[in-house]
Amino acid sequence: MGNHKAALTKQVFTFASELYAYGVREVVISPGSRSTPLALAFEAHPNIKTWIHPDERSAAFFAVGLIKGSERPVAILCTSGTATANYTPAIAESQISRIPLIVLTSDRPHELRSVGAPQAINQVNMFNNYVSYEFDMPIADDSKETIDAIYYQMQIASQYLYGPHKGPIHFNLPFRDPLTPDLNATELLTSEMKILPHYQKSIDASALRHILNKKKGLIIVGDMQHQEVDQILTYSTIYDLPILADPLSHLRKFDHPNVICTYDLLFRSGLDLNVDFVIRVGKPVISKKLNQWLKKTDAFQILVQNNDKIDVFPIAPDISYEISANDFFRSLMEDTRVNRVSWLEKWQCIEKKGRKEIKCYLEQATDESAFVGELIKKTSEKDALFISNSMPIRDVDNLLLNKNIDVYANRGANGIDGIVSTALGMAVHKRITLLIGDLSFYHDMNGLLMSKLNNIQMNIVLLNNDGGGIFSYLPQKESATDYFERLFGTPTGLDFEYTAKLYQFDFKRFNSVSEFKNATLLSETSTIYELITNREDNFKQHQILYQKLSEMIHDTL
């Protein structure tokens, strides 16, 4: 028994030290018995911060938020059995978004698998469709090979924690009773750093010259890292190219004349210009209308993504590059300048008129877009916005016009799962205000526990239209009128003031835009600001905006 304890201690302390060596500074633990050895190892490590969350689904999304905020890999740990399956939604989001989430599932020893033992399900390869790498670790013993396996496997897995290959990885770790390591053996816990992987690629600019010398070009930028925007702006300025900037591109922070923000409303309103080439950068954009245009345009399409797996949605490009945006545009700086002044000015003119129409609309509107517009005004440059999927991200796409704030969202799988938890994870590292609808909020109310337990400050702006507002914009609204409210509207009638009390948030309710205009978003306390809206009225007022912009496009072109 003494040998078992020594072997277990060496295994889990070495594993914790190797995670630290490859950049892990935070671990989110969901309590359980089988995970005891690793949980104690992480708690004993002097340079690893542990977070405790009893809900595995919310815990995993909280870790996703920590990664977004710190730009470092984060590990999650749970016990064996069905607890592990609750990680699946966050792992799926991480896979599509290229987030280096390290999934650690504790398991029963091999002799207790498939024999009816409690809390034992098949955990080997259980996330096979969503992880970049996975390994079923050997059980602790006295052999050198068992410890070597940790070194080898972490070295292999590290390529998925940094660079273009980023994504979630899964280690399944079986533990045999007794489960308690020797906590006095702290000399086995080390804080040495490994040399992290570095990736660099170049392109042959001459191969693109015949395309980029054409006059009518666009740069379309989706979700991407802050540090990749500099060369995009420089290239756009030198070569007179409009930039259609998604709200997650971090380009709308800049008051730059080439940054176009109103394109979703413009394309929705009938804008259809002939274009010679498009340079698509980063992940796919949020705008459905822009994606539809990309599918039908005859323009030559170049895709630039710093990933090992290129996301071609909405349509496969003519050519793609696995390279950072900075490296791509830097390599093109020697090209001959093309006179595109009239082309750029046309876009700038349309953008200016579009912004004017939006401003006039917001001065009169009383719908959700008016609330969102006010929130954007109230958000200081010290704060960032985390935006829920469904209608909130679409309204922000339409209404965020060049303000120096960062915007974040879970746009991998685009689901409403785990939004509260992800935002709270980010709030550990940044000042965050969360904009979310009532159904998305209900879906992850458990996530609020992390704020209560750890005193994490975050404001939540809750758009409450008592149901799923986005369905009012879909064909189901007209084709299934008798069943629409029950199947799609899904009103809940919940009073979220009780939620605020349960998790010790302050609570303020606003029944009109005018009330909200006079409100102050406090940064010292966590507050839920509930904004009461009406789905039908919201739909009708949005149609008015679309019509005004359609008339403007018709008159301009």
From Swiss-Prot:
Pathway: Quinol/quinone metabolism; 1,4-dihydroxy-2-naphthoate biosynthesis; 1,4-dihydroxy-2-naphthoate from chorismate: step 2/7; Quinol/quinone metabolism; menaquinone biosynthesis. One of its GO terms (biological process) is menaquinone biosynthetic process. It is an enzyme of class 2 (transferase). InterPro entries: MenaQ_synth_MenD, MenD_middle, THDP-binding, Thiamin_PyroP_enz_TPP-bd_dom, TPP_enzyme_TPP-bd. It catalyses: isochorismate + 2-oxoglutarate + H(+) = 5-enolpyruvoyl-6-hydroxy-2-succinyl-cyclohex-3-ene-1-carboxylate + CO2. Its cofactor is Mg(2+); Mn(2+); thiamine diphosphate. Its EC number is 2.2.1.9. Gene3D superfamilies: 3.40.50.970, TPP-binding domain. Keywords: Magnesium, Manganese, Menaquinone biosynthesis, Metal-binding, Thiamine pyrophosphate, Transferase. One of its GO terms (molecular function) is magnesium ion binding. Binds 1 thiamine pyrophosphate per subunit. The keyword Transport does not apply. Homodimer. PANTHER family: 2-SUCCINYL-5-ENOLPYRUVYL-6-HYDROXY-3-CYCLOHEXENE-1-CARBOXYLATE SYNTHASE, PROTEIN PHYLLO, CHLOROPLASTIC. Belongs to the TPP enzyme family. MenD subfamily. Catalyzes the thiamine diphosphate-dependent decarboxylation of 2-oxoglutarate and the subsequent addition of the resulting succinic semialdehyde-thiamine pyrophosphate anion to isochorismate to yield 2-succinyl-5-enolpyruvyl-6-hydroxy-3-cyclohexene-1-carboxylate (SEPHCHC). NCBIfam families: menD. This is 2-succinyl-5-enolpyruvyl-6-hydroxy-3-cyclohexene-1-carboxylate synthase.
